[in-house]
């Protein structure tokens, strides 16, 4: 019985932590959009700008000049990392429901990929546009 008294609060805390991390692509889009609006009055995410960003050749890296280098021209299709040759699940949440459901994970990958491909951190506006493109603005 004593074990249950200690175990129950730990389980409740763990489930609360998991629900804090759970998100939807719409939640991430709202968050990045709000951050962008705090930097640019009147900002509205644009799937069209996100598509252009996705297809743009940045040229920072010869091996990874664009998002499409690893993620293919179609974000609903699986990709492959051009350096490690590891498979990459589709970016679009319509093809991969796990995408953009964890803010920490999304921020980690934006941080890593933006530096490697774009050559700098992506702005909140770029992230919002990118998510708008991949989710159809939903």
How should each PLM-predicted stretch be described?
Residues 8-15:
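Bacterial N-terminal signal peptides
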Residues 107-138:
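C-terminal capping alpha-helices of c-type cytochrome domains
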Residues 62-74, 130:
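The canonical Cys-X-X-Cys-His
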Residues 17-22:
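Sec/Tat signal peptide C-region and signal peptidase I cleavage site
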Residues 88-104:
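Short microdomains enriched in Cys/His and/or Lys/Arg
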Residues 1-8:
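Bacterial N-terminal signal peptides that target proteins for export
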Residues 79-86:
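Short cysteine/histidine-rich zinc-coordinating motifs and their immediately flanking basic loops
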Residues 24-59:
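Electrostatic cytochrome c docking/interface patches
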């Amino acid at each position: 019985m004593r074990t249950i008294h200690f175990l129950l609060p730990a389980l409740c805390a763990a489930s609360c932590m998991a629900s804090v991390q759970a998100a939807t692509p719409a939640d991430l889009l709202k968050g990045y959009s709000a951050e962008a609006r705090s930097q640019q009055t009147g900002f509205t995410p644009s799937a069209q700008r996100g598509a252009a960003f996705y297809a743009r050749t940045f040229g920072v890296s010869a091996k990874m000049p664009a998002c499409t280098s690893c993620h293919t021209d179609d974000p609903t299709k699986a990709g492959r990392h051009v350096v490690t040759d590891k498979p990459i699940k589709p970016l679009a949440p319509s093809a991969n429901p796990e995408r953009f459901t964890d803010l920490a994970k999304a921020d980690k990958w934006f941080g890593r990929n933006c530096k490697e491909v774009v050559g700098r951190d992506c702005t909140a506006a770029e992230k919002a546009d990118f998510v708008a493109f991949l989710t159809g603005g939903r």
